[in-house]
Amino acid sequence: HRGHGLARSPRDDFLLYDYLVDAHSAEVIYYFSAQPLLDVPTSMTGIDELAASRDFHGRVIGTKFELVDPLRAVETYDHEFKDIMLPDLPSAAISHSQPDFGNSHTAGVSAHFNATLVSNFFNNVLKRNGIDDKGMAIISMVHCIYLKDGAGPDWRNAVWWNDRMWYGQVSNGSGEFDSYSRYLDVIAHELTHGITQSSSDLIYKDQSGALNESFSDIFGVIINNWYPGEPNLMAGWNWEIGPGLARGGGPLRDMSDPTKTGDPDHMDKFWQTSIDNGGVHTNSNIHNKAAYNLLTIENDAGELMVPPGVVALLYYLTLTRLTRRADFSDCLRALKSVANTYFMGNSSRQQEVRRAIGQAYQDVGIT
C-alpha cells in the first residue's frame, strides 16, 4: 500500500479489477476496483453515427459521465472544428449528464465504440497491450479540420498522427455532418499504422511503404469483419477498404480484386513511380491480394486452410519482426518463419501452412 510517505508498490503500477458476470449471457455486468483509488469503468449507452444504439464503458467524474474507459484506456474528445495543428487540446473528454448519451454526441460515441472494438481485437486476438504494447491510451479527437486542406468545416479524412486519432467530417446536405468516426475499417487501418510506427516502423516509401499501407488494410478488413461474430462467416465478408469514400462513391481499395479500383494485383503490374512515395497506396494492393489469397485458401475438404484469427496473428508477428526497409519478398520469408515457429511441434500442420503461404504469394508473383 502507498500513502503517508511510503514508496511505490506494484499496486500503484498495475490495474487490478474484479467483475461480476451474468451466468446466462456471459456478459460482464459490473466492474469494481480490487485496489484503492482506481477508476472503475461505468456502463454507458448512446446513439452513434449510424443511428445504432451502442453499449460501451466510460467513467464518472462528479456528476458527469465521460467517454474515458479506464480499463481499456480509450478516451474520446471533441475538437470543436478546430485545426489539428493547434497546440491547445480539450481539457476534458466528451461528457453527458446521464449514462445514456442518446443522440447528443453521435460522432464521439462512434469514435469511442469503434476504438474499443479495435482495442479489444489488439488485446484479445493479437495479445498486444495497446498501440505501443506498453498500455498507450487510444485517444480520439472528433470534429477536426486541417486548415492547410481548406477552411472547413468539411475535412474528408481520418488519420493517426501525433499518437492520436483525428476525425474529420463531411456535410451530408441537411445542415449536419457525417463523421469519419463511423468507419470501423478506416479506424482499424489508421490504428494499425500506430502499431507499425511503434514496432517495425517501416519506411514510408517504395515497397516498405506499400507494406506499411498493406498491413493497415489487412487489419482494417479483418477487424471490420470480426464483429459481432468474432469472426463473422467468411462468405459474408466485405473486402473493400473505405467503401463509398472514393471519388464517385466507390471504395478506396478492394482486397479481393484490386483491379476493381484500377490497382495492380500482380508483380507484373508493379507501378514504378515517384508519385505517392513510390506508389505506396497503389502497389500495396499486390500484397493485399496475397493476404486475401491466404485468408480464403481452402483445403480438399472445402475448409479454410488458415482461420482468420490465425492469419491475423501470423501477420502481426511478421509485422513486428520486419526491418524498416523490408520489401515484399522479405515479408514472405518472415511470414514463413513465423509460421514455422507458431506451428512448431506439429510438422504436418507446419508444412500445410507454409505451402498455403507460398501459394498465396506465388499467385501474385511474390517469391
Predicted features and spans:
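Zymogen propeptides/activation segments of proteases
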Residues: 1-187, 194-367
